[in-house]
Amino acid sequence: GPSFCKANGKPCSYHADCCNCCLSGICKPSTNVILPGCSTSSFFRI
């Protein structure tokens, strides 16, 4: 099954949300196509 975000329990496929899916706790922006599993910088969506 899909991995889930530690912060809100949503599937990591919801890149629009600031999910703590990475071990480093970095958020995953939906625009990240090179590294879909992790962002290279913090990304917050209000």
From Swiss-Prot:
SS bond list: 5-19, 12-22, 18-27, 21-38
Modified residues (4-hydroxyproline): 2, 11, 29
Changes after translation: The natural D-Phe form of the peptide is more potent than the synthetic L-Phe form.
Superkingdom to which the source organism belongs: Eukaryota
GO CC, one annotated term: extracellular region
Protein localization: Secreted
Stored Gene3D superfamilies: 4.10.40.80
InterPro entries hit by this protein: Conotoxin-I_CS, Toxin_19
GO molecular function: sodium channel regulator activity; toxin activity
Keyword terms: D-amino acid, Disulfide bond, Hydroxylation, Ion channel impairing toxin, Neurotoxin, Secreted, Toxin, Voltage-gated sodium channel impairing toxin
Keyword flag Protein biosynthesis: no
Expression sites by tissue: Expressed by the venom duct.
Modified residues (D-phenylalanine): 44
Family listed: Belongs to the conotoxin I1 superfamily.
Record function comment: Iota-conotoxins bind to voltage-gated sodium channels (Nav) and act as agonists by shifting the voltage-dependence of activation to more hyperpolarized levels. Produces excitatory symptoms when injected intracranially into mice and is lethal at higher doses. Exposure to frog cutaneous pectoris induces spontaneous and repetitive action potentials. This effect is slowly reversible. Natural peptide (with D-Phe) is active on nerve, but not on muscle. Synthetic peptide (with L-Phe) is not active on both nerve and muscle.
Domains as described in the record: The cysteine framework is XI (C-C-CC-CC-C-C).
Protein name: Iota-conotoxin-like r11b
Taxonomy of the source species: Eukaryota, Metazoa, Spiralia, Lophotrochozoa, Mollusca
